[in-house]
Amino acid sequence: MGRRLAGFLILGLCLLGLRAGSAEIELSPSVELFHEEIGALARGAAESGASAVAGEDGWLFFAPELRHLSVGRFWGDAATEVSRAGQGADALPAIVDFNRQLEERGIHLILLPVPVKAAVWPDKISDAFSVEEGKAVPRVDPYHEEFYRVLREKGVDVLDLSPVFRKQRHTEHGPVHCRQDTHWSGAGIVKAAGMLADRIRAMDWFASPEEPRYEREWDEVEITGDLVRMLTEEAEAPPPEKLQLRFVGGAEAPEVDEESPVLLMGDSHCLVFHSGGDLHATGAGLPDQLTAELGIPVDLMGTRGSGSTTVRVDLYRRCARDSDYLAGKKVVIWCFTARAFTESTQGWRVLPVSP
């Protein structure tokens, strides 16, 4: 490819030392090379003022995502060394405390970190991997896997999509990530919604509707992803990306229900294909797919900003306006991009759920 040589040249100029905590997890040579390459690409993008990095076959990658994957361990003592946040660098205390507060209210938290694109499609951005068709992509984000294990040991229910996304990254309705956008695709959302619904349906309180309540129909759309707008002026803009989305509810998308026992909260991964406008469509996002899978409407608290702290501040303010807001909630799904563990400049503040 030529990209490997360029990556090593940038690496030689910009190498800043060993990744924090990397000695604690033994990386295979190919994974170590992958981390070095994408770290170099991220630094090169930062130096040129670009936020998007072009990969193979029309795939575009978000430079902060590449940086996040390359820094190694990102919690505990390592957090302050690798986080973009000035305060609240460590996500671990905030997540564990949030789970504790919800648990005390009888609410079950499902943590849903969305795998970053490069962790599922490493062969599209690095020479370190050649993925054989039909086989699972090797795990290149072992630090995520370790972090989720630590969270589970502390009582947090983590839904790690990575094994399924890496094994089934090509679906009959397209790839699980958008080529030109920072978000997951319609196919990825449907897969995640099905896995979430399986967990919720197994809970004692849940009673499935007797008949399906919402129509579902796949259709093709064209989008110009947010990463296209992040390319340098010299880069040639690719043609619009064609995506298949599963639209829910026929002529009318299902409405969000504030009294639903299921609250979906998080960053724009909760809003893409749901809110319309520059998020591309309505009626085909995660809230819509969850509603279709469960047969009941869900509540939504999404933000276009960081899903780390801002959305929990929004929850606190909602509870301040209505002290009974959480009274009927059974499940909170906290969904955000996994890169937020290091790339959220707001950090991970420990906050009260309600006044």
Q: Where is each model-derived feature located?
A:
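Extracellular glycan-modifying ectodomains
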Residues: 2-355
